[in-house]
Amino acid sequence: MLEKEEKEEVTITDVDCMHGWNNPRVNCYTDVEIPLTAKLDVSEFTMPVNGRVTSGYGYRPKFRRMHRGIDLSLKTGDTVRAAFSGIVRIVSYEGGGYGNYVVLRHDNGVETVYGHFSKHLVKREQIVSAGQPIGLGGSTGRSTGPHLHFEIRYLGLALNPSAIVDFNEGTPKQNIYTFNKKTYQNYSKPQQQNYSRKNTKPQRKNYSKKKKIAS
């Protein structure tokens, strides 16, 4: 039996397309109930850049934080395109993270995030089509070199883009992606690891001279 606060499944009509529209945060859905499952149409997907995946989605033990998207290779000035048709919700700059970035809102609670632009090519509330240029690649914000940080979010939850898209082929793995809340929670939860410093001091050995036994 489902818990009261959880819906069994949602459709496009269940998500308010204007929810949190004026919220400046990337995740503006913190007050929304997350359904157990949802079917998301991703058939329109277009590669934002023709680059390879240089860093995947997941927990980074070295930095002790989640990487909530993937990084795609590009050169500064390369055109970055909208992955799906939608409306521009955020055009902003974040020095300690995304740098120059854009958030696009799509159907049914889906949003995409594009980070580290050298230049924005769209304005807030602009309607864009899949494949339309939205920015130029760069290395602004927390970045060690030119690349595109790309996220696919559902109701604010950062999904694994590589579970939805085959980035080698540049096409969605399935036209309809099924979101599963329990699977997401298990996948996105970092493994509990012990980061306390281990005692690396070598054990003291007994180097005392042994008595020679007379023959």
For each predicted feature, which ranges?
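Solvent-exposed coil/turn segments that connect beta secondary-structure elements
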Residues: 58, 75-77, 85, 93, ...
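Extracytoplasmic
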Residues: 12, 31, 39-40, 48-50, ...
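A residue-level detector for short acidic-glycine micro-motifs
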Residues: 55, 74, 90, 116-119, ...
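Surface-exposed strand-loop junctions at beta-sheet edges and helix termini
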Residues: 74, 83, 122-123, 128
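Polar/charged, compositionally biased leader and regulatory segments
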Residues: 1-57, 172-215
